[in-house]
Amino acid sequence: MKKRSSLYSCGVLGAAFVICLVVSSCGKNFFFAGRNLPPSGVLNRVLIAEQNPSAFASGALPFDDAFYDIRHAYNASSGQFTIAGFSGKLPLTIENLPEQEGGAVYNEGDGSLSIVSYAKESVSSTVSIPGGFSSGTEPSPYNGISLTRDLGFVYAANPGNHVISVVNQTSNNPIALTLNLPNAYGISVNPGGTVALVFIQNATQASNYAVRAENPASFAVYSIVQLTQAQQAAATNNPNYLGAQDCEPQKQPVWCVFPVSTGASASFDHPVKAVFSPDGTAAYVVNCGPECGGTTASLTTIPITASSLNAGTTGGSGIALTAQSNIPIPNGATNALFNGNTLYVAGQQYQASSGLFTGYLTIVNTPANTVAGTYPISDGLHNRMVFGDNNTLWIGSSQCNQGVRYQQAQAGANVPFGCITMFNTASNTSYIDAYLGDGTGIAAITGLGKVYTTEGGQIYIYSTTPSSTGIVSLDNSNVTIAGTAIDCAYMDAGSDDDNTIY
């Protein structure tokens, strides 16, 4: 049997090699969705943000072959695939844009954004953030920097310098500037790039709080907007044009940051991010509430209509946004992810008996704005969510060893308290892994029934099919790295939705 299996394997590999030769000789350089065949020839690549790979470097971007789970060519025994031309310091997060054959890596060590070409497996450009270092994501559940999916605009928040950075990379009007906004720390941009929301650290906002009726610096959520030429002329030397918090450059403003009003049934309580409905008609702001020092965890809906957008311009254009309603999420809300009209919300609820928080996943029916169910998940700050194969939702958290589950385990209970949860959306069943450190990255390798994670600074691999005892770990011995693995992304995913934080 062993000999027959070996001969069969050799035959399969040989056939695959012949096919590759035929494809190459015929000049075909695409593998699916019209994407270019990359220089490495690897079709299932996982990008790793690696900090301090050696004593002589503070950052690297290696990538693995997720089909074979190796970091080098399948017909070699050593070496490592890597993104060429990368010089960023301490890469922290990866914004995965496989539909554009690229990605953006934020480097916290120098405050830059590296634009990576997946097609060429090299850095195509580096964007300097004019306002300096943007807010980091670890261990917080938000992100402070975002590249629009059309690769045209970069928005970044810097709570230390109290500014928002705007970089317009489009050829018709390139510009880089900062807008003054105290304590701005989170950025969420819709897939179409027409709405760019900014969140204020530790902020609240009551209902019936309207632009022009209140101090423009006293809101909890803002919107970055590019002005039309007529508006630019009208806003000259008026940083508070139409109730804006700031407009820059002041002599002839091009960009403004406008407050988001609240209606009679809407409010904000420590908002941390927003997710957008699949049809693009609404933003759902995640209010962290008690987990972030506030009172009530909830979702706040903001309708996105033609009348609320600034017609005749590009980039952020949410000039007249008004929040309309709140959906209470009693079990906590720090992150959320849509699957059709169902919104999965991760967060923690305070437990008075222990004085600690414990993790929950709340399922929301958005057409009815009602909670359909709540289920236990890992404790900690839930900063990563992504859908995988076999009806699975994967959730990563930081500081999961500071919650109720860890306390119970220390007292002798047989309770897993790891930072990665696999949730089966068909059976509504949670599987929590063993503790390996903070869960800082997840890449769903769709089509192959596995996910890659970065936990405690190392790379791990899991099957999307559980066993009777829980999550199944796969062999990671050929993908581990010397430095600190802080994030990961599936470069060859089918869509830009294979992201975890953006």
Name what the model sees in each region.
Residues 21-25:
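C-terminal motif of bacterial Sec signal peptides marking the signal peptidase cleavage site
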Residues 2-13:
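Bacterial N-terminal signal peptides that target proteins for export
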